[in-house]
Structure formats: structure tokens, C-alpha cells
Amino acid sequence: MVRKIYLALAIFITSMTVSIAHQGATGIVKARMDAMSDMSDRSKQISKMFKGEKDLDRDYIQQSSELFARYAQVLFTQFPDTHQSRMGSKTEALSSIWEDRDGFEDQIDQFVAANGDLQTALEYQVSDRKLRKAFITVARSCKSCHKNYRKE
């Protein structure tokens, strides 16, 4: 079971890896790519902690979760229905973001809720196992959104 969880987490992290395609992005496309890249980098570090490759640092996870919450608040505004946002330089956003706006916003809401659960787990100083489970839920919410709304 643990192997499956780590495999799922590895797939998630791979899908979030910043590609060379980000070079040359401008404007709102670059802003959202930068935010996603930062979340990806932090998620990779947290994943290494849960794999035992790095010491578990709850302060780092807390700071990351707070940053995720700030990024999530602006995600709603970083995908306006404009030509630049839809077709801008190097965008990886699929048209389904605008065609299924309610579904896209539901995905962001799920991420916000999962991240809130992670923050609660940190606040109540739950076991490492429970904290890992909360983080995996956050990671899965990212993967789910990328599956439906991001070019691979």
C-alpha cells in the first residue's frame, strides 16, 4: 500500500515538473506558471521528507501550506477568459478551463479544502503518518486538476 502511495506521489511530482516550455512565457501565463513551479518545488521537497530522503520539517511544510493557500486564492483570477490567457506564450492551460469553468473552480475548491486539512493536521500536531496522508490528498487534488485542465 505504501508503495502505491509513493508511486502516485512520484507520478504527481513528475507531472508538475517545470518544463523547458516555461521559458519565454510572459504576462499572466508566466505569473501562473511561476506560482505552479513554486508549488511543485515545495511539493517535491515535502515528498522527499515523507520518503525519508530528508528530515521531516513541519515548519517547512507549514510555510509551504500557507503559500499554497495564498496561491490558491489568486488561481481564480489567473485564468481570465482572454486571448492572452488562453493562447498566450507557452501556456499549458487547456480550453476546458474556460469551457468547464464551474468544474475548474470546483477543482480549486477541492485543493483549498485539502490544503486546509493539511494546515489543520499541522496545527493539531498529528502523527507523521496522518500528516503524510493529508499531504497526499493535497498532491492528488493537484494531479486531478492537471489531468483535466493542463496540457501534458
Residues of each region from the PLM?
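Sec/Tat signal peptide C-region and signal peptidase I cleavage site
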Residues: T17-Q23
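Sequence context surrounding c-type heme c attachment/ligation sites in exported
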Residues: T26-E152
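Bacterial N-terminal signal peptides
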Residues: A8-S15
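General helical structural elements
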Residues: L7-A8, M36
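Residues in and immediately flanking transmembrane alpha helices
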Residues: M16-T17, A113
